[in-house]
Amino acid sequence: MSLTEEIKKRRTFAIISHPDAGKTTITEQLLYFGGEIREAGTVKGKKSGTFAKSDWMDIEKQRGISVTSSVMQFDYAGKRVNILDTPGHEDFSEDTYRTLMAVDAAIMVVDSAKGIEAQTKKLFEVVKHRNIPVFTFINKLDRDGREPLELLEELEEVLGIASYPMNWPIGMGRAFEGLYDLHNKRLELYKGDERFASIEDGDQLFANNPFYEQVKEDIELLQEAGNDFSEQAILDGDLTPVFFGSALTNFGVQTFLDTFLEFAPEPHGHKTTEGNVVDPLAKDFSGFVFKIQANMDPKHRDRIAFVRIVSGEFERGMGVNLTRTGKGAKLSNVTQFMAESRENVTNAVAGDIIGVYDTGTYQVGDTLTVGKNKFEFEPLPTFTPEIFMKVSPKNVMKQKSFHKGIEQLVQEGAIQLYKNYQTGEYMLGAVGQLQFEVFKHRMEGEYNAEVVMTPMGKKTVRWISEDDLDQRMSSSRNILAKDRFDQPVFLFENDFALRWFADKYPDVTLEEKM
């Protein structure tokens, strides 16, 4: 198969949702259809000992939430599928946002009883900003939920995207009978031995069923007043195809997967800082690091840089340019994933995600190129932390483990590190509280370094240039610190303190982000 044909087979997407909408369960079912797992390990039993394949970190297994984005790959129906499972928890927006830079489409999982929730809305806005297609799976039809028409209306009003139902539920909860499949023009049956039936048989199958009569009325209404189906509008991110189903009972999921792969796009090009778009079908390899993860295998204390291949082909042992440093690197120890399990890979193509073993060479956002190509891809989004804690080792004899742990976890971008200019104390900054809990848990579990963490509350962060820096600017209302790149930064106790500083030093430029 030619390189172009291989690239065109790739489908790389992320799954986004609010916590508990069923995202991990649907991921499991997709892996099941891809032949990667023998049974979908129902995530329901948080005490059952059957853990989701994609939730590999200890704290995720204990709490039943995804806190890092994992990558999984399988072959299905002539396509190579790359799934990026994103954290559903709101505190992990930074990792999630970066992950969404590495995909060509998104699947949005919505709980039929709850509709569009806060985290879904946040993540959707990022996806919308990138103009990538969004496919909606309205989940938990095996339970009582809201009316389908009401859910479609909410999609359009809250998210501002047109919708087109690919199927329609016949009843829900205990009265759930199946799906009226508008796209494939058939009925998908929830009960009994037969999985499908023709629409012509519907009246006979559901004689005297008020839900079926309601479905026919709804469909007539949608055909008259609903949006037109348009493949181009889907690819442009202007229309979301909507599927109903139940991930827990694995109903409607395979039909969803088949239809998703029919319409999901091939790998996209990516913009460089100069505004050029790198064509995925170009023969020269290029890619960018969108995530770094330490200790995916605690036995080996390893670090892996996740790279989205943007163009060309990766071959084991190839040399690449690291644009940020201007130095070369060799990609010899490279892996592909199934959550915590992995295998060495000898080649991969545009659209694929590879993991490069990293001894500290790479940073999130790095661009890799070959030959004379020295461009950089557009920077990934960064977030200014809002809450802070002082951190120190509980046991001074464990200083070495403490420093190693902090260095690795900060390089992942999971948490941000600052050092007090005057006292040398370490301070951690995060977008949400859960990040601190995960940090503490991982320091103790992975680095055997117990830590003492003291809350500092919310702070307003502003960077200043070295040239403007004068230590006398530090006062009781701010803390002067350095970030991990040794850039000076002020942590103001509130917006009033920030305004007071700006009035006192009008010539000093304060930057919101590095």
UniProtKB/Swiss-Prot annotation:
Which sites bind GTP?
A: 17-24, 85-89, 139-142
Which GO terms of the molecular function aspect are on file? GTP binding; GTPase activity; translation release factor activity, codon nonspecific; translation release factor activity, codon specific
List, alphabetically, the GO terms of the cellular component aspect: cytosol
Q: Cellular location of this protein? A: Cytoplasm
SUPFAM superfamilies in the record, alphabetically? EF-G C-terminal domain-like, P-loop containing nucleoside triphosphate hydrolases, Translation proteins
The cross-references to PROSITE patterns, in alphabetical order and at most eight, read: G_TR_1, G_TR_2
One GO biological process from the UniProt record?
regulation of translational termination
Where primarily located? cytoplasm
Ranges for domain tr-type G come to 8-268
Which keywords belong to this entry?
A: Cytoplasm, GTP-binding, Nucleotide-binding, Protein biosynthesis
Cross-referenced InterPro entries: EF-G-like_DII, EFG_III/V, G_TR_CS, P-loop_NTPase, PrfC, RF3_C, RF3_dom_3_sf, RF3_GTP-bd
The task this protein performs is described as: Increases the formation of ribosomal termination complexes and stimulates activities of RF-1 and RF-2. It binds guanine nucleotides and has strong preference for UGA stop codons. It may interact directly with the ribosome. The stimulation of RF-1 and RF-2 is significantly reduced by GTP and GDP, but not by GMP.
Question: What family is this?
Answer: Belongs to the TRAFAC class translation factor GTPase superfamily. Classic translation factor GTPase family. PrfC subfamily.
List the HAMAP family: Rel_fac_3 (MF_00072)
The name this protein goes by in its record: Peptide chain release factor 3
User: What does the record give as the organism's lineage?
Assistant: Bacteria, Bacillati, Bacillota, Bacilli, Lactobacillales
